[in-house]
């Protein structure tokens, strides 16, 4: 049975501590800031949250955000500096019932050590085995013992945290999953247009170059189709030899059938996603639970993606999953999607009709895990 966080009396106060590098602002919000905004907005207990981060001029959620400057960052580093400034803040204003540290294992440990009376949870957006304070089994075992709870964005990330902790017994129940979600902004299935949308951060691990190369090979055999790339610099802005420049060179033979839009506002991205018949999320690395996958499904796109990280948790049965990412395998996948109308439209229908990955579902799962942490600490 789901017990809402709002049912607890008195209403618990929950502080969310962002990584120091995050900028909780409309123009510079990173992936974690976006998830935190969605978590709070979609929660039935939204009024109970305070978001703490590095000070910005304009906040995404002014009514919830408190900006701080990292304390003695030249000595402590930015993340511990921000945590130290946070401890000063709660010394003045009083402690929350729960403080939720996002994606910084060593910060969660620092707060738990400095203020043992604090109920500290850790919200993991990435593999903790690659993080300071979480790389070793002994470090993660310490976190498991000392923290009130650990929330993971996918089963994949949960398994990463518990790697080597088979002997932890009942403590494993402290590690839960609140799978990333996306807001479905469309009220009915959109009319699709004949183009492929390739959107995401222009970094090698996202597989944009391999995917673009594959599309450049296949698209000439499918008249009437085009390619839109969002997230890279425009052609004229791509520095020679840069990753964006390599992508631009790969798709140059397509001429007017391919466009690189550069970084675009979220409203424009939603429009492209709604119109795209096909969306590609070609991650080469073990992506924990990319929002691009969820948004593509929310928009009813025929999605092509990879069996990496937490992606299959959302994409299995709803998308064309490339088992082993390569230019050749991507090309075969696109050839299938472009050439088989029934197959493509069936994926679009499934994506639209079977979409449980809402921001509301994410917030509800996270609130349940927060409640579990609060109850366990009493």
What are these language model-derived features?
Residues 263, 271-276:
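Short alpha-helical donor nucleotide-sugar binding micro-motif in glycosyltransferases
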Residues 319-328, 335-342:
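Conserved acidic donor-binding segment of nucleotide-sugar-dependent glycosyltransferases
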């Amino acid at each position: 049975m789901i017990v809402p966080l709002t049912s607890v009396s008195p209403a618990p106060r929950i502080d969310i501590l962002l990584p120091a590098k995050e900028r909780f602002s409309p123009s510079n919000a990173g992936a974690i800031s976006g998830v935190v905004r969605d978590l709070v907005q979609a929660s039935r207990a939204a009024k109970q949250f305070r978001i703490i981060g590095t000070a910005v001029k304009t906040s995404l959620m002014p009514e919830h955000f408190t900006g701080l400057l990292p304390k003695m960052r030249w000595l402590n580093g930015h993340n511990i500096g921000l945590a130290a400034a946070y401890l000063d803040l709660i010394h003045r204003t009083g402690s929350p019932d729960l403080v939720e540290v996002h994606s910084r294992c060593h910060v969660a440990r620092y707060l738990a050590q400095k203020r043992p009376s604090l109920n500290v949870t850790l919200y993991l957006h990435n593999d903790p085995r690659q993080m300071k304070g979480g790389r070793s089994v002994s470090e993660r075992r310490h976190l498991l013992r000392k923290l009130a709870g650990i929330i993971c964005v996918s089963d994949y990330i949960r398994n990463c945290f518990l790697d080597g902790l088979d002997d932890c017994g009942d403590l494993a129940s402290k590690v839960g999953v609140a799978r990333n979600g996306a807001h479905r902004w469309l009220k009915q299935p959109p009319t699709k247009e004949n183009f492929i949308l390739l959107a995401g951060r222009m970094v090698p691990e996202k597989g944009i170059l391999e995917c673009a190369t594959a599309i450049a090979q296949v698209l000439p055999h499918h008249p009437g189709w085009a390619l839109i790339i969002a997230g890279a610099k425009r052609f004229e802005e791509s520095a020679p030899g840069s990753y964006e420049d390599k992508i631009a060179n790969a798709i140059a033979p397509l001429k007017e059938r391919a466009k690189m839009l550069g970084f675009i506002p979220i409203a424009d991205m939603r429009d492209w996603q709604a119109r795209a018949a096909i969306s590609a999320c070609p991650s080469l690395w073990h992506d924990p639970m990319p929002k691009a996958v969820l948004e593509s499904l929310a928009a009813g796109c025929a999605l092509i993606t990879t069996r990496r990280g937490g992606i299959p948790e959302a994409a299995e049965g709803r998308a064309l999953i490339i088992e082993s990412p390569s230019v050749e395998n991507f090309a075969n996948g696109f050839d299938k999607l472009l050439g088989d109308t029934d197959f493509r439209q069936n994926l679009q229908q499934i994506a639209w009709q079977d979409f449980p990955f809402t921001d509301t579902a994410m917030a509800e799962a996270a609130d349940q895990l927060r409640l579990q942490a609060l109850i366990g600490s009493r």
